[in-house]
Amino acid sequence: MALESSLESPAPVRQIANAIAGWVDRLGAVWVEGQVAQVSRRPGLNTVFLTLRDAVADISVPVTCSRTLFDGLNPPLVEGASVVLHAKPSYYANRGTLSLYAREIRMVGLGELLARLERRRQLLAAEGLFAAELKRPLPFLPGTVGLVTAPNSAAERDVLENARRRWPAVAFEIAYAAMQGPRSASEVIEAVERLDRDPAVEVIVVARGGGSVEDLLPFSDEALIRAVHRIRTPLVSAIGHEPDSPLLDLVADVRASTPTDAAKLVVPDVAEEQRNVRRARERARGALARWIAREQAGLDGLRSRPALADPRMLLDARRDEVDQLRDRARRCLGHALDRAADDIGHHRARARALSPLATLQRGYAVLQDADGHVVTSVGAVAPKQQVSVRVADGRIHATTTSTEELDVQEG
């Protein structure tokens, strides 16, 4: 039944609290899955107090159970364990809190845990979070390495010592986090995101020295996997558990089998790089020496040729041939010029014989009127008309006295 209230007639707090308590009470017993975040056993009390945390969201709820139920659990219930409870929810109106009273507690077995992790893996893989094309290469020599690990842990010591042994100048920015237990996933997420925001950090290493499947459950937390998928900085997972890798190994850009292996992956070995430089220098020196020797041999071969040993020998061998060719060219040119001169004289004689001047020299003349037109007929000249006569060596000016027309056939 809905609670009736309005601005004019608001419901008091007690009424709201009692209504919520009634709704929760009518809910009945429920099966609840979660991770035990805290266990508190108070001396003299027959009740054990637990805190149950959601596996994905940052939500927790207090749980109570009888000491008899708690002590009868096998294996014993410890913090970080995954459980399924059959519990009756209760709402305490005076405090405004919700709690569960557990009537049955079942430990989640390893097989069931692995099956759930596999279903989660398939779901995240279907979203593309583990795609190979998303993997980013690690920088060759990072300026600063971000390290997420537990304080004073063997994993921290292994990463720092091995990295500095390989490259003494490497710098680390360490973000400590719980690497086991109910707070582990949220603290690792916070540490990774803080390092990702640091512009000096070029690669992040999440390191832990192995552990059981239950111990490594935080590194398969869905919220952690999605957080690592979102960051921009390359990340190396160094959880160190070969048989059943946590999902962090799949979303990380590089997986290292151990923290020591992670140190070898994120920084180069200065001694090995120095050896590589020496080997490269020796290879370059050898290649240069071989090239110089090859070119020197070719130059020596050219120098040993007779033509290069005494260049005048080649000129002397060709001198007589050049002289002969020059004489032959001169003779051929002389003959050609003589023939050309004869041809020119012949053509000149023919031209002279055929020219009008030669005709005039044989006694012929050309008669022209006063306008310079050649007179070819007696009809073109009138008596007493001025005319000129062109002869071989000059011109005669005359005046016609009369004309006479001749018969051409008789002429």
UniProtKB/Swiss-Prot annotation:
One of its GO terms (cellular component) is cytoplasm. It catalyses: Exonucleolytic cleavage in either 5'- to 3'- or 3'- to 5'-direction to yield nucleoside 5'-phosphates. Its main location: cytoplasm. Pfam families: Exonuc_VII_L, tRNA_anti_2. Disulfide bonds: none annotated. Coiled coil: none annotated. One of its GO terms (biological process) is DNA catabolic process. Keywords: Cytoplasm, Exonuclease, Hydrolase, Nuclease. One of its GO terms (molecular function) is nucleic acid binding. It comes from the Bacteria. It is found in: Cytoplasm. It is an enzyme of class 3 (hydrolase). Its EC number is 3.1.11.6. Bidirectionally degrades single-stranded DNA into large acid-insoluble oligonucleotides, which are then degraded further into small acid-soluble oligonucleotides. Belongs to the XseA family. Heterooligomer composed of large and small subunits. PANTHER family: EXODEOXYRIBONUCLEASE 7 LARGE SUBUNIT. This is Exodeoxyribonuclease 7 large subunit. It comes from Nocardioides sp. (strain ATCC BAA-499 / JS614).
